[in-house]
From Swiss-Prot:
Belongs to the LysE/ArgO transporter (TC 2.A.75) family. It is a multi-pass membrane protein. PANTHER family: ARGININE EXPORTER PROTEIN ARGO, ARGININE EXPORTER PROTEIN ARGO-RELATED. Signal peptide: none annotated. GO terms for cellular component: plasma membrane. This is Lysine exporter LysE. Its main location: membrane. The keyword Cell inner membrane applies.
Length: 228
């Protein structure tokens, strides 16, 4: 049990700090768009990284520094792009600001009355063309923030995997499960907490400051990547 708790605390220490992943989850939780797919991507990515590191894949990453350099600059480019979109959304006019609670769109469909032969229009719920695709961009962002981030490979594959292997052949997997429980707890917590308070947080003035804060976080993470 103590090994699992150690793994949980280690995993929590790596993901609690506000970084690109957490910022994205909070942002989409407030918007109520694509939250579940993002949580699935983040958790499955951690499953791969944590168990890959525990299995010893981190040693391969340590021997391929050029791969980390390529990932570094791809990550820098994406962080700059995402930060720009946050600043752009922050400075939209109030009329274009996020609205979480909107009335459902409706459409009118012609319906023929069999007895009178008169055609009337019936009010039905309209299906937005892009409604089923709102999760695509956030999911791609989650994938980019995870797999184009060299820190994910160093912190999880190399460092966490190395610490896990100090607990022996059996104990290392208990440690890994503890670390995974941290991801299973933290990501849904911040996502659904953001959704719970989305009515307040999505007000134009608040949403503007949130976007500015996330944009600044992206720029800080970008600078950290460049300097490492």
């Amino acid at each position: 049990m103590s090994i699992a708790i150690a793994g949980f605390l280690m995993g929590l220490s790596l993901i609690v700090a506000i970084g690109p992943q957490n910022a994205l989850i909070i942002r989409q939780g407030i918007k109520r768009e694509g939250l579940i797919p993002i949580l699935v991507v983040c958790i499955l990515s951690d499953v791969i990284l944590i168990f890959g590191g525990t299995a010893g894949v981190g040693a391969l990453v340590d021997r391929a520094p050029i791969a980390l350099v390529v990932l570094k600059w791809l990550g820098v480019a994406y962080l700059l792009y995402f930060g720009f979109t946050c600043f752009k959304e922050a400075f939209k006019r109030h009329g274009q600001a996020l609205a979480v609670e909107q009335s459902e769109p409706v459409a009118y469909e012609p319906v023929a009355d069999a007895s009178s032969g008169v055609i009337t229009k019936t009010r039905t719920k309209a299906q937005p063309k892009s409604a089923q695709r709102t999760w695509v961009k956030p999911v791609l962002a989650a994938l980019a923030f995870t797999w184009l981030n060299p820190a994910a490979y160093i912190d999880v594959l190399v460092m966490l995997g190395g610490i896990a292997n100090q607990h022996g052949p059996d104990g290392r997997w208990v440690f890994a499960l503890g670390a995974l429980c941290a991801s299973l707890t933290w990501f849904p917590f911040i996502g659904y907490t953001s959704t719970r308070f989305s009515t307040v947080l999505s007000r134009p003035a608040v949403w503007r400051y949130i976007n500015i804060a996330i944009g600044i976080i992206m720029m800080i993470m970008c600078a950290r990547l460049i300097m490492h």
